[in-house]
């Protein structure tokens, strides 16, 4: 059976690999010159299932108002003329309640934990190397209020069976020795020992080679025009003016997914969250992070690769603008300079931006559609790397008619129809 996958980021490439293992004939098409050239190119590098949380959380609307007045705010909104932007923000606000947050976080943790297990299995089976570290993630709290507010997340971690440690200042210094010199700036931390790090682009490129060895064909530099349908079936995809036909189709185009789906009558509530990163050469390994640090105040991640530090964060709701904002670089430099002042050479840092495909509830869209041969694997937001292997494995099982190892409930696009019905009946807008 022939499958055409649109998109060669980490999600599309992993999907291709797992489908090829199931015996499918797979073709991957992308407009770029190689895999992982857009959102997967220079992300924060963290594989952090336990920290999988929706931006749409209780209290976020009030925080967003305060953030608008702050120079180094983690979230910024740049109004555009697009109705999609306002529609998406309204949907996000409807999810900012305790009931929705609990449901959405459970779904995100479910797919993320499974994804980490799939990544472990894949690494053991293939020996793929991507500067991986299995040393956990440490979320830093600068105030006691942040420590106290972590209680709701800890409750969900307990419910999901995710191991964690609450650290005081001494514990922080033990877990991340380079932070000993700045311990007085910190009130505590939440550490998840099973989290990992790794270079997403390196992983994707190497996995693409492994997929090719399984027979996957990658076609780069192609313009994907539109999907053609006939009744409840996708009959082909127009690529560079030519109709390409397959038995099944997978759309993994990230933030650009809605553009392809809207003409088909599928409303995918995905909007780009613009993020930034710095890649910094390490000058003193003893003064650099050991694994991944999350600064709760600035929502910035600092990740250790072999000889580099990757600093990533920010979320701009600004449409498809890919210009580099110097103020965002200032924020990233502020955070890494504050916590690891002697770890790397900021004068040699590389500044990058990418668009994360975010859903209003934070959960990716993985699974079937109203078209019998069209499947989606998109909308992973800031956690595409974390969720990629689990999403790809889940999708491959569904397409092969196998029972997945985790529940797929609430992960496909039909949940938004249920959410709309719940809202119309006056119930909380949880994507049930």
Curated annotation (Swiss-Prot):
Taxonomic superkingdom: Bacteria
Family matches, as InterPro entries: DadA (IPR023080), FAD-dep_OxRdtase (IPR006076), FAD/NAD-bd_sf (IPR036188)
Q: Which cofactor does it need?
A: FAD
| A GO cellular component annotation in the UniProt record | cytoplasm
Give one Pfam family: DAO
Q: Name one GO molecular function term.
A: D-amino-acid dehydrogenase activity
Give me the reactions it catalyses. a D-alpha-amino acid + A + H2O = a 2-oxocarboxylate + AH2 + NH4(+)
Instruction: Cite the EC number.
Output: 1.4.99.-
Q: Which PANTHER family does the record cross-reference, listed alphabetically? A: D-AMINO ACID DEHYDROGENASE (PTHR13847:SF280), SARCOSINE DEHYDROGENASE-RELATED (PTHR13847)
Annotated function: Oxidative deamination of D-amino acids.
Q: What is this protein called?
A: D-amino acid dehydrogenase 1
The protein's gene is named: dadA1
